Amino acid sequence: MLQELSRLNVADNTGAKIVGVIRNLGGSVKKTSNIGDIVVVSVKKAIPNGMLKEGQVVKALIVRSTYGLRRKNGTHIKFDDNAVVIIKEDGTPRGTRVFGPIAREIREKGYLKIASLAQEVL
């Protein structure tokens, strides 16, 4: 579960490395987000000459969470870090590569382009 002010790693090649959550989208009283949710983030650390600069505000999709996720078949899945993929307004990724594994729930929620770019779908 990720809340406002959480720091997240970026799992794509947009140039951002660390982002901070500004707002959880999906309702006025939504306090936390998990895998597959969209959040508004601010770029905290970025590489020089990258697509994104420090201080930019963008939308991102959560692809990994240390909190974990319970699936309908009873299994639990947890990751080693909290990570996001930066997306455009229409839900397509801004980068051209996605690093590390992502959860299968990303594909089930309709983000097929992100799932196809990922190295591994768990």
From Swiss-Prot:
This protein's UniProt keywords: Ribonucleoprotein, Ribosomal protein, RNA-binding, rRNA-binding
SMART domains linked to this entry: Ribosomal_L14
This protein's record includes keyword Ribonucleoprotein: yes
Disulfide bond positions: none
Highest taxon, organism lineage: Bacteria
Keyword ATP-binding: no
GO cellular component: cytosolic large ribosomal subunit
GO MF annotations in UniProt: large ribosomal subunit rRNA binding; structural constituent of ribosome
GO process terms (BP): translation
Function description: Binds to 23S rRNA. Forms part of two intersubunit bridges in the 70S ribosome.
Family to which the UniProt record says this protein belongs: Belongs to the universal ribosomal protein uL14 family.
Entry-linked HAMAP family: Ribosomal_uL14 (MF_01367)
Subunit-structure text: Part of the 50S ribosomal subunit. Forms a cluster with proteins L3 and L19. In the 70S ribosome, L14 and L19 interact and together make contacts with the 16S rRNA in bridges B5 and B8.
UniProt cross-references to NCBIfam families, sorted A to Z: rplN_bact
Protein name, as recorded: Large ribosomal subunit protein uL14
